[in-house]
């Protein structure tokens, strides 16, 4: 039971905080007042989409935007775009000559946010590729000139391929660079008992997320930090 009598009825709630009121306080006090107008517009447009649960939360968008500025990221990659909220957060953070290689299997969703991204004046930073990411990653890895060239890589896509992505992008991110894996607390399901009520998609991907978390914790090539922001994000800093 959460504060004020609020109870999450099932695993699959967007906020990991036990108090909806506390999460709303964070949004209204810290996030929404400082949210760029373009990100607000895209967030509101995305909220009308039937698959709006796929979007990056506003607090995570704020976090990513600041993180990219702190590490002075310039060459970045995003696997899984949806309507482009996190992509826009990235594009606004990196310098004018920065680049984002963005990949998603559905261009139609990306085009929902594209007019807003264009209006924000950052579309020139984005190279969008429609289709599965693994073939593109294999091609990049094959050319050793691409090794260690990315400052930041954000993964928010098919959870059953996260480990396959990690095997490839670990070579592409520079030593000292960051990889961010989204949804690593997966609606809180990572600590839920097997018989807990879960939405079908949450239950399906749960074991893949658990497998990823164990693999990242055991990978000596990275330092990690798992944060309860949004639906959980694990930051991996490459050290070798």
From Swiss-Prot:
Keywords, in A-Z order = Lignin biosynthesis, Magnesium, Metal-binding, Methyltransferase, S-adenosyl-L-methionine, Transferase
Please state the Enzyme Commission number of this protein.
2.1.1.104
Q: Could you say which residues bind substrate here? A: 14, 156, 187
Question: Which tissues does it occur in?
Answer: Expression steadily increases from the bottom to the top of the plant.
The answer to whether keyword Magnesium applies is yes
What is expression of this protein induced or repressed by?
By wounding and viral infection.
The record's annotation in CDD domains points to: AdoMet_MTases
Binding annotation for S-adenosyl-L-methionine: 56, 78, 80-81, 86, 104, 133, 158
Which Gene3D superfamilies would you find in this protein's record? Vaccinia Virus protein VP39
Disulfide bonds listed in the record = none
Gene Ontology MF: a single term: S-adenosylmethionine-dependent methyltransferase activity
Q: Where is the signal peptide?
A: none
> PROSITE patterns from the entry?
SAM_OMT_I (PS51682)
Highest taxon in the source lineage:
Eukaryota
Q: Which Pfam families match?
A: Methyltransf_3
Cofactor section: Mg(2+)
GO BP terms, alphabetized: lignin biosynthetic process; methylation
Residues annotated to bind a divalent metal cation = 156, 182-183
What does the note accompanying the cofactor annotation read? Answer: Binds 1 Mg(2+) ion per subunit.
Uppermost EC category: transferase
What catalytic activity is recorded? (E)-caffeoyl-CoA + S-adenosyl-L-methionine = (E)-feruloyl-CoA + S-adenosyl-L-homocysteine + H(+)
Biochemical pathway: Aromatic compound metabolism; phenylpropanoid biosynthesis
What family, per the record?
Belongs to the class I-like SAM-binding methyltransferase superfamily. Cation-dependent O-methyltransferase family. CCoAMT subfamily.
* Task of the protein: Methylates caffeoyl-CoA to feruloyl-CoA and 5-hydroxyferuloyl-CoA to sinapoyl-CoA. Plays a role in the synthesis of feruloylated polysaccharides. Involved in the reinforcement of the plant cell wall. Also involved in the responding to wounding or pathogen challenge by the increased formation of cell wall-bound ferulic acid polymers. Methylates 5-hydroxyferulolyl-CoA more efficiently than caffeoyl-CoA.
What's the protein name? Caffeoyl-CoA O-methyltransferase 5
* Name of the coding gene: CCOAOMT5
